[in-house]
Every structure is written in structure tokens, then in C-alpha cells.
Amino acid sequence: MSAFIVLGAQWGDEGKGKMTDYLAEEAEVVVRFQGGNNAGHTVEVGDKQYKLHLIPSGILYDDKLNVIGNGVVVDPKALFEEINYLEGVGVKVTPEKLIISDRAQLIMPYHKTLDVLKEKARGKNDIGTTGKGIGPCYTDKFERCGIRVCDLMHEDVFKEKLEENIRMKNEYITKVLGGEPLSFSEILNEYLEFAKKLRPFVQDTSVKVYDNIKENKTVLFEGAQGMLLDIDYGTYPYVTSSNTTAGGVCSGIGVGPNMVTNAVGITKAYTTRVGKGPFPTELIDETGDWIREKGHEYGVTTGRSRRCGWLDLVIVKTAARVSGLTSLAVTKIDTLAGLEKLKVCVGYKFDGKVIDYFPASLEDLAKCEPVYEDFDGWDDSVAEARTYEELPENAKKYLNRIAEFTDTKISIIGVGPKREQTIRIDSI
């Protein structure tokens, strides 16, 4: 039995798409357990590039079962747009390759309207939402007024729940947020059409995943975003609306913790984040700009430029602790090639002492000053390496320090965006 998790160990955008695609070769089932189409994965296979948002990365293989679990929030319109995109580039998406939990919450048009209007109302205190309705959908889930996929499969149930939600949401949208009311009939007709297309993909995914694990099939749980965007352990409130840590797997798909054998944390060789929020090692200078351009650090989903900075090992160590990481995959060491000197954060100066953990309070975090160690850089030959031995010595020293500080072995190294630009040095 082998069931393992692939998680982001930073603020997302660590290269999970590529690593999930790489590791999916060893898996028979690939499962998304949280988030929605606010996530973005880029996978390069040969000379082709694929951009995924909601559908698991295993869809690029013909022989993998891909699962969207109950912890995911599903926008049917975005789902079928992604299916059409994949079909258009030659990737088949059928109910034999993709199944969707009947317990997953549906993103509705009013969720997206609320997302945009509430963000606008926050003014300078906006949190950088993607505007895709993710947060409002999770809010409805916990307020117990959300509409699930299984509700959409029963027209009378869906109609009743939609009518109640439209009545309440329109009052809030018009009277509090100053927006335009949404049409009940338009949404009803649109979603009943979605129901017909969605039905063949829908089943109890918890049972399906459980059965596959019991049959000793290899299952890969694919995380979206990153540890520091977790609703509990991230830089709150500049976070996403779900649990992005290993704990989210059990509730987000419906399997017990004893069924998960390993957890791989994905980290870049440097640090990035999108939008607002604290970033202790951020480089607001030419070096930061250089990393952004060389690393093509622009969001897959939003197109927003990413803030760039030195590698912060305090963050990665926190991710290893919170999610019980059994190994790390370090990506994009090729991006740093050409820099003569590098810095790595190994602690924060805070209130006269050095700490190696991430404070909960943003006010405390703002007072933290990074403690750096210096490293010599390496050249572009790193992108040609296919074994650990072929890596430049300075790159090896850099990687060894990551493993030492986080007390977590490195199992995989990414030296470029393509599937074949991956070095496997240990088991996960």
C-alpha cells in the first residue's frame, strides 16, 4: 500500500505541477483534496506546455484515475472550460479518467460576485483574492447553506436551495455592497445544463480512493497553493480558504491518516509569493527583478507578477513540522544559476533573540529581521545535470544545507521546467 502527498512548502507556485506530473508516473490514482480553480499548475512535456487549474495533473497520462475530492470547491463552468481546453490539445478527459465527489461544494455565480464586491469594499485592506468565488463558497459550506454536487443531481433539491440562496445573497449584494441582483432563472437554467454534463463524472470518491488504497494501488494526493497560504498556519488573513497542509487530505477526500505513508514538500531554491502579506526575505531590488524574469515568475491563474526573495528555510522547516514531511523536492535551482553570491535565511532576529519558527502575529512578523548565511553561486551547466554527481559543487553545498536545517532529506531536484529536467536522488 502506498499513498503519498505532494504539498507546497512555501506560498504556492513552488513547481507542484511539474513534480506531481513527474511523480504521477509512479501512481495509479491522482487526487485533488482542497482549493479550486484559483490554483494554477504548469506542466511541460516535451515541447508542449499544459496549464491546469482544477483538474489533477495526472490527467496528462492515459492510464491514471484522477479524482476531485469533497474538499475541493468546483466551478462547473471553469471545469468544462478546462476539459474543452485539454481536449483541444489532445488530452482525453472521460469519466474513466476523471471522477468528482458528490460531496464537493459548487461555486455559484453569486460567490464570484460577492468575492469581487467584498474585495472592493475592503479598499486598501484588500487581501488579494483571485475573484473566483473560492472564499465565499467555503463560507457557505461552513454556514451550512452551500450547494453540493449531489444537490445538483436532484433538480427539485437544487431549485429549492438555489432559490433560498439567491433571495438572501441578492439582498446582501444590493443593499450592503451596492451591486446588481442576480437572476434566479438564468442561473437555474445554466446549472441544469451543467448537471447533464457533470452526471457521468460524479460518484462517492471517498469510497473509490479507499478501495484503491486497499487494493495496494499507488495514490498521489495533490495539494494546491502552499503551507503559508493555509487558513490556520498561513500568514492570516493573506491566505486561501482551505487547509493546504497534510491534515487537509483526510477531511478533503475521506481517508484515515493511517492510510497516508509519505509526504513530499515542494520548495523553490528561492522564495516567491503573490499579492499582499509579509515576506521577510523579499528582494525589492535588481536581484529580485532578475530572479523574477529568469524564473518567469508570473501567475498561471492571474498573470500577476510574483514577489521574489532569498530562500527562507524558517518557512520550509515550519512546513516540514506541520505536515510531517518525509522528504523535499527542491525546484528551480537553474533559475539561480549566474548569481555570484546567494543568501539563505536560517532564522529571524526578534525581540533581541534569534528564533527559527514562523510567528502567528503579522505584527510580530513585521519586527522580524532575517538572519542570513552566504553561499557561492553556480553556472548554467546545472540545467544539463541529470544526476546528483553532475551538479556543481556549490549547488550541492546549497542543497545539503537545506536538508540539514529542515531535518528533512531531499529526494528530488528540479533543474528546469521539463519533465526530463528532474534528478531523483532518494525515495520520497
From Swiss-Prot:
Active-site positions on this chain: D13 (proton acceptor), H41 (proton donor)
Subcellular location: Cytoplasm
Alphabetically ordered keywords of this record: Cytoplasm, GTP-binding, Ligase, Magnesium, Metal-binding, Nucleotide-binding, Purine biosynthesis
Swiss-Prot/TrEMBL cofactor(s): Mg(2+)
Positions that bind GTP: 12-18, 40-42, 306, 332-334, 414-416
Enzyme Commission number(s) of this protein: 6.3.4.4
Free-text remark on how the cofactor is bound: Binds 1 Mg(2+) ion per subunit.
Tagged with keyword Signal: no
Residues that coordinate or bind substrate: V300, T301, T302, G303, R304, S305, R306
GO CC annotations on file: cytoplasm
Cited InterPro entries: Adenylosuccin_syn_GTP-bd, Adenylosuccin_syn_Lys_AS, Adenylosuccinate_synth_dom1, Adenylosuccinate_synth_dom2, Adenylosuccinate_synth_dom3, Adenylosuccinate_synthetase, P-loop_NTPase
Keyword Metal-binding found: yes
NCBIfam families: PRK01117.1, purA
Function comment: Plays an important role in the de novo pathway of purine nucleotide biosynthesis. Catalyzes the first committed step in the biosynthesis of AMP from IMP.
UniProt subunit comment: Homodimer.
PANTHER family: ADENYLOSUCCINATE SYNTHETASE
Name of the molecule in the record: Adenylosuccinate synthetase
Species the sequence originates in: Clostridium botulinum (strain Alaska E43 / Type E3)
